[in-house]
C-alpha cells in the first residue's frame, strides 16, 4: 500500500522545487516536438496572437506541451476520494500502468478534472515577452518550468480558479506556489502514468 506523504508547508515545497526542476528536464518526444513547434511559431514574422483565434491556438499549444508529460500529479483530495477507495485503480497506479484519464479522472460526470499548475496564460505571456525570433533555449527554459498537470477535485479547482501565481513569482520558482496559496495539497509520492491520449 502506498504511504501518503503530503506537501503542505513552505519549507517542504521549497526543497521540492529542486526535485521538480530535475524531473522537468526529463522530456519525452512529444514535449521536445512542442518546444520546436512553439519556437517556430514565435519566430514567424507574421505571427500575431491578436489576430483571429491565434491567442487561443497558441495557448492550446502550450497546454498540449504540458499535457504531454508521461506522469500527472495527484491532489490529496483526489487521492482520498477517488484512488484510495478503489483498490483496482490503486493497484494499477502502484504497478505504474498507463491509464486512460477519461476513464478515471476526466469528464463532466467525474468529480475531478485535469488542472494546469501554471496557467497557460502566464506561460503564454512569458513566451510572447521573448519577442520575435527567440532562442530555442529561452523557449525551452520557460516551457520546462511551466509546471505539470495535477488531478484535482472540482471542489479544489474552485479554490485554484480564484488564484493567480503569487506576486513576484518567476519561472525559476516552484510551480507549486499557486497551490500553496490556495491551500490545495499534492501527494508527494504519487504519480499517475498517462496513456497516449491527451484530454484538454
PLM feature spans:
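Amphipathic alpha-helical interaction surfaces
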Residues: 95, 120-124, 155-159
Amino acid at each position: 500500500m502506498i504511504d501518503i506523504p503530503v506537501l503542505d508547508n513552505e519549507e517542504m515545497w521549497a526543497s521540492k522545487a529542486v526535485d521538480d526542476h530535475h524531473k522537468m528536464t526529463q522530456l519525452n518526444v512529444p514535449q521536445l516536438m512542442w518546444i520546436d513547434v512553439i519556437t517556430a511559431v514565435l519566430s514567424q514574422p507574421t505571427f500575431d496572437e491578436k489576430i483571429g483565434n491565434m491567442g487561443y491556438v497558441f495557448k492550446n499549444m502550450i497546454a498540449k506541451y504540458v499535457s504531454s508529460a508521461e506522469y500527472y500529479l495527484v491532489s490529496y483530495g483526489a487521492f482520498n476520494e477517488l484512488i484510495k477507495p478503489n483498490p483496482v485503480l490503486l493497484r494499477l497506479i502502484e504497478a505504474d500502468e498507463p491509464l486512460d484519464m477519461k476513464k478515471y479522472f476526466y469528464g463532466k460526470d467525474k468529480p475531478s478534472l485535469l488542472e494546469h499548475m501554471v496557467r497557460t496564460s502566464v506561460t503564454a505571456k512569458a513566451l510572447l515577452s521573448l519577442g520575435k525570433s527567440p532562442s530555442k533555449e529561452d523557449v525551452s527554459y520557460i516551457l520546462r518550468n511551466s509546471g505539470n498537470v495535477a488531478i484535482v477535485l472540482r471542489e479544489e479547482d474552485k479554490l485554484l480558479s480564484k488564484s493567480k501565481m503569487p506576486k513576484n513569482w518567476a519561472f525559476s520558482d516552484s510551480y507549486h506556489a499557486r497551490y500553496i496559496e490556495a491551500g490545495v495539497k499534492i501527494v508527494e509520492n504519487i504519480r499517475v502514468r498517462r496513456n497516449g491520449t491527451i484530454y484538454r
